[in-house]
């Protein structure tokens, strides 16, 4: 596949320079270059991994996590609320960014998640109805495949009108699942008391169901991600130039006659040499939730006090840059299955079974290697706890109860921060809010050993146990806030990431309630004889004792890879994603999302980028 040399890019008359060829950046590259008269340049720090089997195979993420050829392999600072653990924070280091290294979950947010951006935060253009066309625009539902056409709509629900069919990102359903899930899904329904959603992609997804994944099953199943979907089909466009192995150091700015600042280009490093790329129209920062704020700070845009410490001249002071970091967390309940019942652990343990599933993947496009997670579901917090528990949690939310020493926003009681707390508190009271997600995982999900290196999350069942099954729990609307900032004036130094995990007690409460529910399901009468011993939490832990469950949660979490909010709309960028105080500079990636949404953020990031492309083209007709 042809790529551009750095010299060619330096000598090109570029209208737009996109920093980051990741999930959002390649959407912009494809859409902006549809206009023949526009010249687009893309800078990517990683390499191209198109056609790489580790990227393509749906179960290949475990081979990339922690591998610095594929993963930036960031680490958090020690987390006080979790006994000073240091967490692995993966980010894709290649064309496609984190869409090339994630677990390919495809979901859409609740309508209220997006409507709040518009109605409560005052961001015109960002309602659910205004974002939905862009959610559909990026998607290509594989509607002709038998497992879609002949699906049981009660098990695998969606309405055809809500789906996109002409987009770049394939979405599909797995043709294979472990037999245990035939019994698990009714047990989830009965224990929760919630019916299955009619269409979890139309703005409400409470209940349990088989879900879509970003996997292209038109031939042998492969990951569908921004490099394969948006870039590969159009890489030969003469007005699109992509250079890899090139790090953006800082955005270059100049002053206008009226004293205002504007972005003029980007300083980059390639093979140790510094180069300057000029942008005639705009510089667009799409480096992700950790590196977009880092590059802003390296460019002199950020908190003046932090920039002073780094000896970086302050061009535009904005104390919000790098703050408001939000990340969901995962914990899990793990049971062994009855003797002879298979899960992915069986495939990991048995070489002959592994060969069988490799053959299924290659020849029948099925089996565990084609994508083994099928079931997910969402429940309200209020459906799982007592009214007194709800009152206690909401009291903590509204009273600014935060662990001492945790990262905090510059103005904890400002309108933006109050809006977040009030929105989450209102959701916690509702019996229709998707506050918790449950990911049904046919393997031992080992958070105790995986937090520092996510490649160790699925080690197989422990010695002396049968194959295992996990109900993985996540809180969708975390209250804890973190930060990411540069550590020096050297743009090659990794940023300091302090997610503030579990620094707000409400996050512990919500995950603990999910752990208790997961155990009620797996120990229910409906699954008697289908499961054996509880593996995690250990049988000695009393899951009826909320304090014991809270302690368990603090020691058994990993990241969900959904970090966002560090260049938030309304704080760092405006509603058209323009950096405040600097003309011709935008940020387009997960960092602009002001608050977490209920579900994986992949589809929302694609939609934000699709919408941003239209806004950019409208501003430069």
Curated annotation (Swiss-Prot):
The active site is at 562 (proton acceptor). Signal peptide: none annotated. It is an enzyme of class 1 (oxidoreductase). Gene3D superfamilies: FAD/NAD(P)-binding domain (3.50.50.60), Glucose Oxidase, domain 3 (3.30.560.10). InterPro entries: FAD/NAD-bd_sf (IPR036188), GMC_OxRdtase (IPR012132), GMC_OxRdtase_N (IPR000172), GMC_OxRtase_C (IPR007867). Pathway: Mycotoxin biosynthesis. It comes from the Eukaryota. Its EC number is 1.1.-.-. Homodimer. This is Dehydrogenase.
